[in-house]
Swiss-Prot record:
UniProt-recorded name of the protein: 3-dehydroquinate dehydratase
Gene behind this protein: aroQ
Lineage of the species this protein comes from: Bacteria, Pseudomonadati, Gemmatimonadota, Gemmatimonadia, Gemmatimonadales
UniProt cross-references to InterPro entries, sorted A to Z: DHquinase_II, DHquinase_II_CS, DHquinase_II_sf
Similarity section: Belongs to the type-II 3-dehydroquinase family.
Record pathway: Metabolic intermediate biosynthesis; chorismate biosynthesis; chorismate from D-erythrose 4-phosphate and phosphoenolpyruvate: step 3/7
Naturally occurring in which organism (per UniProt): Gemmatimonas aurantiaca (strain DSM 14586 / JCM 11422 / NBRC 100505 / T-27)
Catalytic activity entry: 3-dehydroquinate = 3-dehydroshikimate + H2O
EC number(s) on file: 4.2.1.10
Amino acid sequence: MIIGVLNGPNLNLLGTREPAVYGTATLADIMAHLEGVAGALGVQLRTAQSNSEGALIDILHDWRGVVDGVVVNAGAYTHTSLALRDAFTATAIPFIEVHLSNIHAREPERRHSMLASASIGMICGLGADGYEFGLRGLVRALELKRQSTATG
């Protein structure tokens, strides 16, 4: 199984960007931990980060038929990007949305996700651990779907 991990705008600044909100772990720290978790689960990761909405969409298009699912932190595009949501639905890649902070306890403009209704689920407010929980949840959901299809 191959899982993509897609990170959106400003996540490259983790560790220094508003540590009281996002924590002190860098994106590299989070991805290194996730690689270890993936190894224990027997899955491979493909990771990408971009500050550009178009680049994130291109990555999803490129991952079509390559990855089995995606863990995504779309950053601020979560709240604004119908195009990113459309890329997920157009590629039919199942995904779990993760956020370091609890978006539902943030400013009003950050409380709505354009992606959530198309996702398998959302994990928010658990800091860097949310990525691990998202990966584990996605792998489990995909395994259950495969079992259901096989016995269907």
